[in-house]
Curated annotation (Swiss-Prot):
Record's cofactor remark: Binds 1 potassium ion per subunit.
Binding positions for (6S)-5-formyl-5,6,7,8-tetrahydrofolate per the UniProt entry: 21, 77, 116, 447
Record's keyword annotation contains Magnesium: yes
GO cellular component: cytoplasm
Protein name stated in the entry: tRNA modification GTPase MnmE
Gene Ontology MF terms in the entry: GTP binding; GTPase activity; metal ion binding
Length: 447
């Protein structure tokens, strides 16, 4: 991190304002060279940027003296007019001074390496930039603010405290320490194991908020899946024709429901076919549906009359039966279908997707369902697979430590140490020296 880096902080393309940022030891000299002087830290000043005596632009210049900056280093920002030529001129001037174009995420990486952020907070920055819904914004902002870090560090602190006592019993057996320290540590370890278990249950919710709740539209050809998709997203995302088998591949469309991001997928009609391309579409439909959070079995109210094994193979209890084209059947037929699907443990939604406003029953029901599925968690939710993997590892070591209580204290201590390291990997902060600090501060060793 000895070199000074630069990069545009705003998107490409013409805009009213563009921001170019730099970070590194040469930042102050670069600001003086382009702007003529170095402003007071953290104050915006209007300066004309020049290169070799030629004006580049009138800009707002901000100077941040490390470590009081985003990266923890000396840094600066140039707020220039957003025309492409202006931005290119400023970037060329920085490159001519020997600065290096930053790699993707390098400013945030420097912030992490300088202790301004931990890994979960750095991930929160990325998630906040990518946030498309209010729920994603709230979750990312909480993560950036340290909600996950604080929980993981609190858990790790409990483990370090228990480990300090266990290590002391091993390393200083002649000191006046509480008897059977492993047994005394057990209640706290049990409580922590349960908390981590609950967080793991909640981790899938966090990933769904971040990545989107996956909803598959499945059913026979010409049941109205594509029509329903288009009605829900309010545009012609899928081709609709009267020819069965029109949809051959998965059509994924993002849709915000209840303030949460969802991914709605129109899939190939499920049926046996000799057509190689259609058969591949059916295979992909089954695979996508199997990994979906919810499957909507779209049924043609007028045509459905026998058990359709190709469709039922992907349906699970708790999925939905969407009875479509209800405008084509009478009340008796509708009641018969409703009873049939309810008996199979499916939630029934009735609609006529091709009619104006016909998809609203599905939209309203889906919004309620997604809110119920993704809101109201007790914990700040883990958002990435690596979080869940480290939490699972920590929980496994805790369970092993609890099974070792009553055996050698060294075994319990080692498992607790490994559990603490697993939690440390989530935030990127691993410091084995703090175990020794706890030992010497908690006990009067050598008295």
């Amino acid at each position: 991190m000895n070199d000074t880096i630069y990069a545009p902080a705003t998107g490409a393309g013409a805009a009213a304002v563009a921001v170019v940022r730099i970070s590194g030891a040469r930042s102050a000299d670069i600001v003086r060279g382009l702007a003529g002087d170095l402003p007071k830290p953290r104050r915006a000043v209007l300066r004309q940027l020049t290169r070799d005596g030629v004006a580049l632009d009138d800009a707002l210049v901000l100077w941040f003296q490390g470590p009081a900056s985003y990266t923890g280093e000396d840094a600066a920002e140039f707020h220039v007019h957003g025309g492409r030529a202006v931005v290119e001129a400023v970037l060329e001037a920085l490159a001519a001074e020997g600065l290096r174009l930053a790699e993707p995420g390098e400013f945030t990486r420097r912030a992490f390496e300088n202790g301004k952020l931990d890994l979960t907070q750095a991930e929160g920055v990325a998630d906040l930039i990518d946030a498309e819904t209010e729920a994603q914004r709230r979750q990312a902002l909480g993560q950036l603010g340290g909600a996950l870090s604080q929980r993981y560090e609190a858990w790790r602190g409990l483990l370090v405290q228990a480990l300090a006592m266990l290590e002391a019993a091993v390393d200083f057996p002649d000191e006046e320490l509480p008897e059977d320290v492993a047994a005394r540590a057990r209640p706290g370890l049990e409580a922590l194991e349960a908390e981590i278990g609950a967080a793991l249950v909640d981790a899938s919710r966090g990933r769904r908020v971040r990545d989107g709740y996956r909803i598959a539209l499945v059913g026979a050809p010409n049941a109205g899946k594509s029509t329903l998709l288009n009605a829900l997203v309010e545009r012609d995302a899928a081709i609709v024709t009267s020819t069965p088998g029109t949809t051959r591949d998965i059509i994924e469309v993002p849709l915000t429901l209840g303030g949460y991001k969802t991914l709605l997928a129109d899939t190939a009609g499920l049926r046996k076919t000799e057509d190689t391309i259609e058969a591949e579409g059916v295979r992909r439909a089954r695979a996508w549906a199997a990994g979906a959070d919810l499957r909507l079995w779209v049924i043609d109210a007028a045509m459905f009359h026998v058990k359709q094994d190709d469709e039922l193979a992907v349906i699970q209890r708790g999925d939905w039966a969407v009875i479509n084209k209800i405008d084509l059947v009478d009340a008796g037929r509708l009641a018969e279908l409703r009873a049939t699907f309810s008996e199979q443990g499916l939630k029934v939604v009735e609609l006529a997707a091709r009619k104006p406003g016909g998809a609203e029953p599905a939209r309203a029901a889906l919004s309620t369902h997604v809110i119920d599925a993704l809101s109201g968690a007790e914990f700040p939710a883990a958002t990435r697979i690596r979080h869940a993997e480290s939490l699972t590892e920590a929980r496994t070591y805790l369970q092993r430590a609890l099974s070792d209580v009553g055996l050698e204290v060294e075994l319990v201590a080692e498992d607790v140490r490994l559990a603490a390291r697993a939690l440390s990997r989530i935030t990127g902060r691993i410091d084995p020296e703090d175990v020794l600090d706890r030992v010497f501060s908690s006990f009067c060793i050598g008295k």
